[in-house]
Structure formats: structure tokens, C-alpha cells
Regions:
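A long amphipathic alpha-helix within ATP-dependent nucleotide-binding catalytic cores
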Residues: 246-298, 322-327
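Pepsin/retropepsin-fold aspartyl endopeptidases
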Residues: 333-402
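ATP-binding N-terminal substructure of ATP-dependent carboxylate-amine bond-forming enzymes
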Residues: 2-121
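Glycine-rich phosphate/pyrophosphate-binding beta-alpha loops
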Residues: 302-312
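Protein kinase-like catalytic core scaffold
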Residues: 174, 235, 281, 297-300
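Active-site nucleotide/adenylate-binding loops and adjacent lid/helix of ATP-dependent enzymes
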Residues: 22-33, 37-44, 48, 90-91, ...
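Phosphate-binding site of ATP-dependent enzymes
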Residues: 185-272
């Protein structure tokens, strides 16, 4: 891929009108109605509680049995099973926050698509959720965009363990994992060829349609979970490897603490969130030995990150941050429909970035978006990834979104 050095004055950005108004929230959850006390659904329950406390009109939608209906005047509501009145939704004042489990059934995702088609902002979109739930697809997309990931190959069939190991080009031990799965479930530590073949054959016997991945093992004492909302980093926590295990998931008993990110780690995590189209995601990585200089190993991106352990480690209330950020309606449409061609390029100040080729009017301009823009005395200050650039203001056009 061709790398282009872009100097500061070449930045083009959209200026969004900041607009804070009263808004409404619908929370989509796969939680069974009877499991209110379960830690598995902690975040959806806390979202509902805090929204009510803040005076936000909120509705917890249980995906099983729910549907979207439209009356003769075009008004839309989404009721839970047994709730005839339901919850009124509109793209003008409603956002949908999607929690884990929606990828269990196609009909759940189809309901999300119906909601998206009404113009309602969804956190996250169906596209983002489907990318993140497919670990191999995520790995390919991250690597194609220039991020560093563990070497990963598909295990083609029940007799394909040895072939996959050869393609991996690694030594034992290796990691065998299912292509879907969260919280460290479906991840196995393999120390020999015999062990690999046995595990692969057993898993295929249990499910002939299973998709398995073989991944190089990166020895580490911890990994890091970074919370990203609206392309901004909220905080990061270190998850120490469980004693006697190789996993570092909080749900598996890992000890946790706050983690201070290096500049390159911050940049890579924001890029990972953008690549999967995530409004609110958790980015997991293993730091490089020289984390100030080298890229981290991005492990995966979670489209429904938990908040309990993160708040315990960082003292940051992610749910409160989320509701505050989306109070500003200009943040509702941070994921426009993709068009044109995407490219990775190096900016003189901001470093490696992802730009979108503007295909309108036969243009060959690469467009990037700044986090903040300040215009003063015919100068403009661009803020992106924690860095700032000042340049002369040549021309500005305000574009109202949403």
C-alpha cells in the first residue's frame, strides 16, 4: 500500500453543530426477563437505572418476543412481549444502545436493522456487531489497515490442525479458539501436535459446523482493555493473567488495575475502533516490549464491553460518560454510510491515520475527521489523537449532520 506524507494544511474536516436536547434511550438486551440479578447483564441494568436517575426516558427492550410496529400515521413503537403500549421511537429524539447477546439469533439482528432503517442512531450498528463477533474477520480487517495482530489462521476441518500449524509458522505452544465467543470462553492453550489434533477432532465432533482459529501465542503477564466511545478513549485497565491459567479475562477471575497508555497505544486503539465502525467498543491488546515505540498486538474488539470490572479498576463511570456524550446530538451520527475508498497514510504530525477518499466531483482528496476544531483570528487548531496542529484558515464550510 502506498504511503503518502500529508502536511498539516491538507486537513479537511466537517464541523458539526453541537446540539444538546432532551433525548430518549432504548436498550436492546438478550437478557431473559427473569435474570435481572445476573452479573452477565450488569451493564444493561445499570444503564436503565442511571438513565432514569438522570431523567432520561428509557426502555429496556427484551429481544425475545419483541418487534417493531408502525401505526397509520407512521409513528413507530417497540413493545416487549405482553406490553401493548410499548415504547415510542423516532430518529429525532431516540438512540438505541445494543448490549451483548444480540448476535445469538438472526431475528434479533433483523430487529436491529429495522431500527437502523428508521434513521435511529444505534450504539453499535449491526455491521459493527457482526464484524466484532467474527474474530477472524476482525483480525483480517485490523491487519489490512496496518495494525499489529497475532498471526491467525483458520483450521479448515477436523483433520486440519497440522496444516493450520504449518501455515502459522510458529512453535508450540499455540492458541486454539472458536471464531465466536466472549469472556475467555472457547479459548484453549495447546502445547503439542498431539494435543492440537485431539482438541480439533473433539471440537468438530461436538459441532461439525464449528469455525476454529489457530493463533500464535504471545507470552505476557497481562493484557489491556481500552474503552473507546465516539472515537475517544475513556480509559484503560490492565488485566493480569490468572494464576495457573493463560487467560486474563475479568470474568475468569483476573486481577485488574488502571493502565496508562502510550501515545502509539492510544492511536492504535482509536484506529481499531474506527476500523470496525464502533461507537462504543472495548479494544483488547498485548503491549509491545517497547510500548513507547512499537505497535501493540491488537487481540480483538468487543462491541458490547462490560463496565463492572472497568469501573472497579479505573474509577471511571463508563455508563455516565456514555449518556453524557450522546446528550450532544451531533455525536449521534459519527458513523456515516461508507462510500469511496479507504486508505492508510502517514500524517507529518498525527502519525498513521485512516482516510476516506472523497469521490464526489471527481475529487482525489483524502478526508480525515478531527476530534476538535477551534477557529480563531483566521487560524484553525486541529486536535486529533491527543495532538494539535495550527494552520491558516483558507476556507471553511459548516455541514449540519443528523
Amino acid at each position: 500500500m502506498k504511503t503518502t506524507i500529508i502536511k498539516p494544511p491538507a486537513i479537511i474536516a466537517e464541523v458539526k453543530e453541537k446540539k444538546e436536547e432532551k433525548y430518549r434511550v432504548v436498550i436492546l438486551t438478550a437478557r431473559p426477563f427473569t435474570e435481572e440479578k445476573s452479573d452477565v447483564y450488569h451493564t444493561s441494568s445499570e444503564l436503565e437505572k442511571l438513565a432514569k436517575k438522570l431523567g432520561i426516558d428509557v426502555y429496556l427492550l427484551f429481544l425475545e418476543g419483541s418487534y417493531l410496529k408502525k401505526d397509520k400515521d407512521g409513528n413507530r413503537t417497540i413493545p416487549n412481549e405482553g406490553d401493548e403500549e410499548g415504547f415510542s421511537i423516532s430518529h429525532k429524539d431516540t438512540i438505541a444502545i445494543v448490549r451483548g447477546g444480540i448476535d445469538r439469533k438472526e431475528i434479533f439482528k433483523d430487529l436491529l436493522s429495522q431500527i437502523e432503517n428508521t434513521g435511529i442512531a444505534t450504539i453499535n450498528s449491526r455491521d459493527c456487531i457482526e464484524i466484532c463477533s467474527d474474530k477472524y474477520r476482525t483480525s483480517l480487517m485490523l491487519a489490512d489497515a496496518g495494525l499489529r495482530t497475532p498471526v491467525t489462521v483458520l483450521v479448515p476441518n477436523e483433520k486440519g490442525g497440522s496444516l493450520a500449524f504449518e501455515k502459522l509458522g510458529s512453535d508450540y505452544p499455540v492458541i486454539l479458539k472458536t471464531n465466536t465467543g466472549t469472556k475467555g470462553v472457547g479459548v484453549l492453550f495447546v502445547e503439542s501436535e498431539r494435543g492440537l489434533e485431539s482438541m480439533v477432532q473433539l471440537l468438530y465432533k461436538l459441532d461439525e459446523n464449528i469455525a476454529l482459529l489457530l493463533q500464535s501465542y504471545i507470552k505476557t503477564k497481562f493484557d489491556v482493555r481500552v474503552m473507546v466511545i465516539n472515537n475517544k478513549i475513556i480509559g484503560a485497565m490492565q488485566r493480569n493473567v490468572v494464576e495457573g491459567d493463560f487467560r486474563s479475562n475479568y470474568s475468569q477471575g483476573a486481577t485488574i488495575e488502571e493502565y496508562e497508555l502510550s501515545d502509539i497505544e492510544r492511536e492504535n486503539c482509536v484506529r481499531a475502533a474506527k476500523i470496525v465502525g464502533g461507537s462504543w467498543v472495548g479494544v483488547d491488546f498485548i503491549p509491545a516490549e517497547d510500548n513507547e515505540k512499537d505497535q501493540p498486538y491488537i487481540l480483538e474488539v468487543n462491541s458490547s464491553p462490560g463496565t463492572k470490572g472497568f469501573q472497579e479498576a479505573t474509577k471511571i463511570d463508563t455508563i455516565k460518560k456514555l449518556l453524557e456524550i450522546y446528550k450532544d446530538k451531533s455525536n449521534w451520527w459519527n458513523q456515516p454510510t461508507l462510500c469511496g475508498v479507504w486508505e492508510t497514510f502517514e500524517h507529518e504530525i498525527f502519525g498513521n491515520l485512516i482516510g476516506k477518499m472523497d469521490t464526489g466531483n471527481s475529487s482525489e482528496t483524502s478526508v480525515i475527521h478531527a476530534d476538535e476544531i477551534e477557529v480563531k483570528d483566521k487560524n484553525v487548531v486541529w486536535s486529533l489523537n491527543g495532538k494539535k496542529v495550527k494552520s491558516k484558515l483558507i476556507k471553511m464550510k459548516d455541514i449540519k449532520l443528523g
